[in-house]
């Protein structure tokens, strides 16, 4: 998909609903469309120890490990765009645990309620001292996040699914504090725009 993602409102809504259905199904079936979650984790760079830590929150739908490259520091605030079941939120939370009384913060936003249900359930099972973990329902093109409120924005194989990528990136930069950092793992189509038939193919929505 191109960066512009210029479509009509009806096309945007259709594409968004296709993606929502695909990921709701993944959340309920606890499986990746690309590989088994365990195999997918190995392929994209999570360490064995990280795999054990995140447990059932990783459904194998990412395409990288952005928290490995974001240079996260204790006490920072991190936002994960399209957090799914929370894998990168939990990994970020562990890295930004506060010290000397300053708490870290890890916030995930996703438009799929079923994914957020899994993320919140996993959060209740974990012990994460020195950091606040939160999940919010929302869309990347209109984030339910305050302006200039986070130090780092991460995203894992989600922005490519947005029909309006410019809006999603504008929102990411709106949420960042001055001097903040953006670390994204994603897939990019070089060259021509994808045909409409591929954009609306539910089998490719993951």
Task: For each feature predicted by the language model, list its residue ranges.
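A short SAM/SAH-binding and catalytic strip from SAM-dependent methyltransferases
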Residues: 151-164
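Class I SAM-dependent methyltransferase SAM/SAH-binding core
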Residues: 74-142
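A short glycine-rich, Lys/Arg-flanked "PGG" loop and its adjoining helix->strand segment in the class I
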Residues: 97, 166-181
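Acidic carboxylate diad motif detector
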Residues: 184-186
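Short, glycine-/aromatic-enriched active-site segment of Class I SAM-dependent methyltransferases
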Residues: 188-206
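A short acidic, Gly/Pro-enriched loop at the edge of an enzyme's catalytic core
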Residues: 141-153
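N-terminal auxiliary segments of SAM/dcSAM-dependent transferases
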Residues: 2-43
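Conserved alpha-helix/loop element of class I SAM-dependent methyltransferases that forms part
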Residues: 38-77, 91, 95
């Amino acid at each position: 998909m191109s960066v512009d993602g210029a479509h009509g409102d009806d096309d945007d809504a259709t594409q968004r609903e296709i993606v929502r259905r695909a990921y709701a199904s993944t959340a309920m079936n606890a499986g990746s469309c690309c590989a088994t979650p365990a195999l997918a984790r190995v392929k994209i760079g999570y360490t064995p120890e990280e795999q054990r830590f995140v447990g059932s929150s990783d459904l194998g739908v990412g395409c990288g490990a952005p928290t490995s490259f974001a240079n996260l520091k204790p006490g920072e605030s991190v936002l994960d765009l399209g957090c799914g079941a929370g894998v990168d939120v939990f990994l970020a939370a562990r890295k930004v645990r506060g010290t000397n009384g300053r708490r870290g913060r890890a916030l995930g936003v996703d438009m799929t309620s079923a994914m957020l249900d899994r993320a919140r359930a996993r959060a209740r099972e974990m012990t994460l001292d020195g950091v606040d973990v939160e999940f919010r329902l929302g869309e990347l093109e209109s984030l339910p996040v305050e302006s200039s409120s986070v130090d780092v924005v991460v995203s894992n194989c989600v922005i490519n699914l947005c029909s309006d990528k410019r809006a999603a990136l504008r929102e990411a930069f709106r949420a960042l504090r001055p001097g903040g950092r953006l670390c994204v793992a994603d897939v990019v189509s070089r060259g021509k725009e994808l045909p409409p038939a591929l954009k609306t193919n539910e089998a490719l929505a993951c």
